[in-house]
Amino acid sequence: MPTPNAASPQAKGFRRAVSELDAKQAEAIMSPRFVGRRQSLIQDARKEREKAEAAASSSESAEAAAWLERDGEAVLTLLFALPPTRPPALTRAIKVFETFEAHLHHLETRPAQPLRAGSPPLECFVRCEVPGPVVPALLSALRRVAEDVRAAGESKVLWFPRKVSELDKCHHLVTKFDPDLDLDHPGFSDQAYRQRRKLIAEIAFQYKQGDPIPHVEYTAEETATWKEVYSTLRGLYPTHACREHLEAFELLERFCGYREDRIPQLEDVSRFLKERTGFQLRPAAGLLSARDFLASLAFRVFQCTQYIRHASSPMHSPEPECCHELLGHVPMLADRTFAQFSQDIGLASLGVSDEEIEKLSTLYWFTVEFGLCKQNGEVKAYGAGLLSSYGELLHSLSEEPEIRAFDPDAAAVQPYQDQTYQPVYFVSESFSDAKDKLRSYASRIQRPFSVKFDPYTLAIDVLDSPHAIRHALDGVQDEMQALAHALNAIS
């Protein structure tokens, strides 16, 4: 049952907490600029789904779009039923293909399954090639002589990367809250900031998977912005951040150059994460499409921006930037259980429909970005959107928002707030519990295969046949034998 956030001793009224800050911090947190619209993966996923639905408003146009076009010729794969008629329906169907000058590559008939009284006795499978413009007319004519005409291409699997090197293709930026495009962006009127952003973004555009991430020489103003964000948030972490974040943050300060007067370099941080959990960073020029971003997680690759928020708005950014990535995401990705949780979301996204991408993006929003967890009888923050935003971190653990137990089915369809602070947060019993619930949710997503990440080849194994599954089981058996040997050695 939803409850107000009364689980933490530090919970208090949000406005009371803000009133205890100095005037500058309070103004920054409550200003319209701070609570302005934020970008998220959900917006992009929703746009992609709506675009797909618009394209599918006509069933025939949707079918035509699904078929492969080659030099103006449409390659069709069709299934249809043949009713018992005079003249035979097969003869009439072949006549349709002749009329539209189709080149038949394959034609096969088989008894309909299951055969019921009154149902057509035969099904027909046809693969053919016809001029693209005549596809709608051919379908219309075929439906007059056959039943249940459908295209096998309608259930085609969308492309997704199979090898880590193919992440070079996963760099599609969405229309974003950009200093060049949006009047409300704090950097819109700052030409120097806009040019700086373009210069840093070029690193991401030129990057190839496996290359060292080029260093950025940050300016004095950028470092000053980092210092204000770093020192302000660091003072709040001991009472508001989860244990895993605190432990990783201490290690990052000891071994990775995290400090007030220096912005960490992505290459150094990436090497640290690789040793801890196998995650790596990859430079990104801005907010990526939801499908591309989630696919990267499947390979334990986190697409990470290098530019920093504008100096006039240090307490908040409406888009991904390095304070959000380095202070919010990176410490959590250094935890093994949370890293696995993040990868599981990515694996669940591979090859699924736009509708499922939107749901997974919403799940990501309410967990990885704005998630809460229980620890030692208190509620703590683990979401990067909370841990990189002073005002939202205060708000999330105050008495104002509604706190609900984490349920992936509910979180995946929960309306989110991008105009101000979240009115609803989901709290997990533990990361392990959240991981188990996510895997249960992902197992119900409809796709004609399963996937498995191979950490040796950094590739995705598609489990779509008995042979592929047997091959995967061989690897599991090898690991089990090694563990059994280890148990024998210590017993």
From Swiss-Prot:
- Posttranslational modification: Phosphorylated on Ser-19, Ser-31 and Ser-40 by several protein kinases with different site specificities. Phosphorylation at Ser-31 and Ser-40 leads to an increase of TH activity. Phosphorylation at Ser-40 activates the enzyme and also counteracts the feedback inhibition of TH by catecholamines. Phosphorylation of Ser-19 and Ser-31 triggers the proteasomal degradation of TH through the ubiquitin-proteasome pathway. Phosphorylation at Ser-31 facilitates transport of TH from the soma to the nerve terminals via the microtubule network.
Q: Which GO terms describe its cellular component?
A: axon; cytoplasm; nucleus; perikaryon; perinuclear region of cytoplasm; synaptic vesicle
Could you list this entry's UniProt keywords, alphabetically sorted: Catecholamine biosynthesis, Cell projection, Cytoplasm, Cytoplasmic vesicle, Iron, Metal-binding, Monooxygenase, Neurotransmitter biosynthesis, Nucleus, Oxidoreductase, Phosphoprotein, Synapse
The EC number(s) attached to this protein equal 1.14.16.2
> Which BP terms in the Gene Ontology apply to this protein?
dopamine biosynthetic process from tyrosine; heart development; hyaloid vascular plexus regression; response to ethanol; response to hypoxia
| UniProt-annotated location(s) | Cytoplasm, Perinuclear region; Nucleus; Cell projection, Axon; Cytoplasm
CDD domains, A to Z? eu_TyrOH
Which residues does the annotation list for site: Important for substrate specificity? Answer: D418
* Reactions that this protein is recorded to catalyse: (6R)-L-erythro-5,6,7,8-tetrahydrobiopterin + L-tyrosine + O2 = (4aS,6R)-4a-hydroxy-L-erythro-5,6,7,8-tetrahydrobiopterin + L-dopa
| Annotated control of activity | Inhibited in feedback fashion by the catecholamine neurotransmitters, especially by dopamine in competition with tetrahydrobiopterin. Phosphorylation of several Ser/Thr residues in the N-terminus regulates the catalytic activity. Ser-31 and Ser-40 are readily phosphorylated to activate the catalytic activity. A Cysteine modification induced by N-ethylmaleimide (NEM), inhibits tyrosine 3-monooxygenase activity through the modification of the Cys-170.
Q: Under the GO molecular function aspect, what terms does this record hold?
A: iron ion binding; tyrosine 3-monooxygenase activity
The protein's matches in Pfam families, at most eight in alphabetical order, are given as: Biopterin_H, TH_ACT, TOH_N
Principal cellular location given in the protein's record: cytoplasm
Q: Which cofactor does it need?
A: Fe(2+)
What general EC class does the enzyme of this chain belong to? Answer: oxidoreductase
Positions modified as Phosphoserine? Answer: S19, S31, S40, S465
Residues recorded as binding Fe cation, renumbered to this chain, are: H324, H329, E369
Which pathway does this polypeptide act in? Catecholamine biosynthesis; dopamine biosynthesis; dopamine from L-tyrosine: step 1/2
Q: Self-association or partners: how does it assemble? A: Homotetramer. Interacts (when phosphorylated at Ser-19) with YWHAG; one YWHAG dimer bounds to one TH tetramer and this interaction may influence the phosphorylation and dephosphorylation of other sites. Interacts with NT5DC2; the interaction results in reduced phosphorylation and decreased catalytic activity of TH.
- Function comment: Catalyzes the conversion of L-tyrosine to L-dihydroxyphenylalanine (L-Dopa), the rate-limiting step in the biosynthesis of catecholamines, dopamine, noradrenaline, and adrenaline. Uses tetrahydrobiopterin and molecular oxygen to convert tyrosine to L-Dopa. In addition to tyrosine, is able to catalyze the hydroxylation of phenylalanine and tryptophan with lower specificity. Positively regulates the regression of retinal hyaloid vessels during postnatal development.
PANTHER family noted in UniProt: AROMATIC AMINO ACID HYDROXYLASE, TYROSINE 3-MONOOXYGENASE
Q: Which family does it belong to?
A: Belongs to the biopterin-dependent aromatic amino acid hydroxylase family.
Q: What is this protein called?
A: Tyrosine 3-monooxygenase
Q: Give the organism the record lists.
A: Bos taurus (Bovine)
